[in-house]
C-alpha cells in the first residue's frame, strides 16, 4: 500500500507577526489574514515555550496548551488559551506550579491541570481563566535542604457525566487517584499492583477506567464507584515480576467505546496494541515508530492517531510524525511529518480536526537544535487528505 506523506515545515506565517505588531494595518485586512489561516488544511504556529499536553474545549471555543517555560526551582507554569482556527494565543494563564497535563469537563467548563512534579491538580474556570483552586493528591515532603517532593501525576482523564477526575501516578509502585469534581476531594487512592501507571482511558457507558502501565498486567480495569480493580489485561509477553524486565510500557491509551476496543501506545516497542475488551485479548499490533507517545481515536472517522517523537537512546537525532491508522484493517492511511518531536494529540468534538503539540530538541547535539526556538502547535484537517 502506498502511503500519502505530508511534510509540515517549521515556518511560521510571517504575515501574522507583521499584523500583530503593526497598528497601521487596517483591521479588515488583519481579519482577512486570520480568516485565510483558519481555512487552510494545516496550520503551524511556533509560539509556545515549553509546550506539553493539548486539550480541545469547544464549549468555550478554545484550545488549551499546558506549558512549562522553565525548570528552575520555584518556577511556575502557564496554560495558553488559543483560538482554535488561527492558533493565536488569546490568553496566558499564569500558575504557581508547573503545568504538564490537561483534562477538560465540558459540562462544568472546568479545566484540570496536572502539576506533575508537585503531585497536584490546578482547577481553572475555562470560561474566563480564573483559578478556582488546587487539589493536593500526593503528600508533599520537604527534605533537609528545603527541596519539596511529591508523588508525580501523569495523565488526567475527566468523566463529565459523573463529575469525576482520574489521575495516574507513574512510580515503581503506582497509584491512581479518583477525585470528586463537586467537592475537589480525593474519593479513592488505588494501588495498581504494577509499575509506572501512566496512560488512561475511560469507558463512559460502563463506568470503567482503563490504566496502562508496565509489568505482568499492562492494563488494569478499575471500578470508580469503589476504587477496586475488577480486571486486568495482559499481552502475556512479560514473565518476570521485576519491573526492569517489563517488555511493554503503555504510556498512553484511547478507547473505542462503541466497538469495545482499547488502543495502547507502547513506548517500549513503538507499536500500538489493540485489545478486544470483550475477551481481553490482543487482536492487532501496529508498528508506528521510535518514541511512540500519545494516541487518540476518532469515532467519526474510525481512525487511530498516534504521535511518535522519532528518537531513542540509540537514535538521538531523528524527528517524529503523526500516524493515522485505519480502524477497520489497521493499515496506515497517512503519515504527517512534524519535526522535530510531536508530543500530545487531541481531537475536535466532531473528530475531524487534530491538534498536536510539537517540541524542539532538548539539547544542542540534535542537528535541528536552534537557540531560543519555540515549541509549536499544529492544526490538521483530517478531511484534507
Which residues fall in each region the model found?
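Gram-negative bacterial Sec-dependent N-terminal signal peptides
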Residues: 1-23
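Predominantly soluble domains enriched in secretory-pathway, periplasmic, or organellar proteins
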Residues: 18-385
Amino acid at each position: 500500500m502506498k502511503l500519502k506523506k505530508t511534510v509540515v515545515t517549521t515556518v511560521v506565517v510571517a504575515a501574522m507577526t507583521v499584523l500583530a505588531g503593526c497598528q497601521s494595518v487596517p483591521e479588515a485586512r488583519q481579519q482577512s489574514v486570520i480568516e485565510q489561516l483558519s481555512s487552510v488544511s494545516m496550520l503551524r504556529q511556533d509560539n509556545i515555550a515549553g509546550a506539553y499536553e493539548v486539550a480541545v474545549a469547544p464549549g468555550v471555543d478554545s484550545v488549551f496548551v499546558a506549558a512549562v517555560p522553565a525548570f528552575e526551582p520555584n518556577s511556575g507554569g502557564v496554560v495558553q488559551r488559543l483560538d482554535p482556527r488561527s492558533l493565536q494565543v488569546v490568553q496566558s494563564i499564569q500558575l504557581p506550579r508547573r503545568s504538564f497535563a490537561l483534562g477538560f469537563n465540558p459540562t462544568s467548563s472546568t479545566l484540570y491541570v496536572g502539576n506533575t512534579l508537585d503531585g497536584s491538580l490546578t482547577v481553572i474556570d475555562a470560561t474566563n481563566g480564573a483559578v478556582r483552586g488546587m487539589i493536593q493528591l500526593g503528600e508533599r515532603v520537604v527534605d533537609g535542604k528545603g527541596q519539596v517532593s511529591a508523588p508525580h501525576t501523569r495523565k488526567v482523564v475527566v468523566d463529565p457525566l459523573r463529575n469525576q477526575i482520574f489521575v495516574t501516578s507513574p512510580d515503581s509502585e503506582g497509584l491512581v487517584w479518583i477525585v470528586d469534581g463537586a467537592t475537589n476531594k480525593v474519593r479513592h487512592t488505588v494501588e495498581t499492583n504494577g509499575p509506572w501507571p501512566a496512560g488512561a482511558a475511560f469507558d463512559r457507558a460502563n463506568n470503567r477506567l482503563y490504566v496502562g502501565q508496565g509489568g505482568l498486567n499492562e492494563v488494569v480495569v478499575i471500578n470508580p464507584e469503589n476504587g477496586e480493580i475488577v480486571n486486568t489485561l495482559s499481552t502475556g509477553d512479560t514473565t518476570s515480576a521485576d519491573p526492569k524486565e517489563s517488555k511493554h510500557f503503555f504510556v498512553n491509551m484511547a478507547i473505542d467505546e462503541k466497538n469495545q476496543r482499547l488502543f495502547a501506545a507502547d513506548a517500549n516497542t513503538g507499536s500500538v496494541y489493540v485489545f478486544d475488551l470483550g475477551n481481553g485479548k490482543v487482536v492487532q499490533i501496529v508498528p508506528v515508530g521510535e518514541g511512540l507517545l500519545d494516541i487518540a481515536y476518532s469515532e467519526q472517522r474510525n481512525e487511530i492517531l498516534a504521535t511518535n517523537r522519532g528518537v531513542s537512546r540509540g537514535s538521538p537525532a531523528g524527528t517524529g510524525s503523526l500516524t493515522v491508522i485505519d480502524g477497520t484493517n489497521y493499515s496506515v492511511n497517512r503519515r504527517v511529518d512534524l519535526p522535530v518531536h510531536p508530543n500530545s494529540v487531541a481531537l475536535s468534538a466532531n473528530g475531524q480536526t487534530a491538534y498536536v503539540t510539537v517540541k524542539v530538541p532538548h539539547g544542542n547535539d540534535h542537528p535541528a537544535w536552534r537557540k531560543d526556538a519555540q515549541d509549536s502547535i499544529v492544526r490538521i484537517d483530517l478531511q484534507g487528505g
